[in-house]
Amino acid sequence: MSTNLIVANIKSYETLEEGKSWIEKFLAHKDSFSNLTQKEIIICPPFTLLLSFSSAFLGINIKIGAQNVSPFGEGAYTGEINAKQIKDFAEYVLIGHSERRKNFAETDDMLKKKTEISMNNGLKPIFLVQSKNAIIPQGVEVVAYEPVFAIGSGNPDTPENADEVAGVLKSENEYQVLYGGSVTPENVRNFTSKANINGVLVGGASLDPEEFYKIIENA
């Protein structure tokens, strides 16, 4: 049986105090974490909470990811957070989310740079695509298919279509392919039971640690 990756993208939510509350509620399930076999849990908080989350889950089989990374290395790049800095707190990084492609005009060339600099610094990219025809940089191992219409809409793609897209992506390379877009505790198994889907990327539902834990249990 293959491992399902269950990824939480908390996006630009949660203050320091709210993040502490999230952690406390999620850790209430700590005793049952060992029962989550064949599931790898990755939580991607905002930059301001990377230290809190990485410290809270130290020694527990929960991985931490960042939501973004600078396309530059160390240097005079005011406001940027580079891969070397992120590596102190996280193992994974999200690259290519449609919100960043749209709101920050991130191009395929920029995403390639982000991917390369992440891998060169020991981070594992989770590369997000919106279609089966997306350009995926060399070296990527985990791809998340997130159709734009499904993000935060409550209107997910059909499991059958998501599985078909995942199959096309896998035909190009041996990726682990995740599905993202309006994932809930009620529908998650419809996706993870498909042959070509290796997990889910959870957005809105991950803001509630109880909902996210239910998704993990049901996946």
Segment roles from a protein language model:
Residues 1-219:
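Active-site loop-to-helix "anion-binding N-cap" substructures in soluble metabolic enzymes
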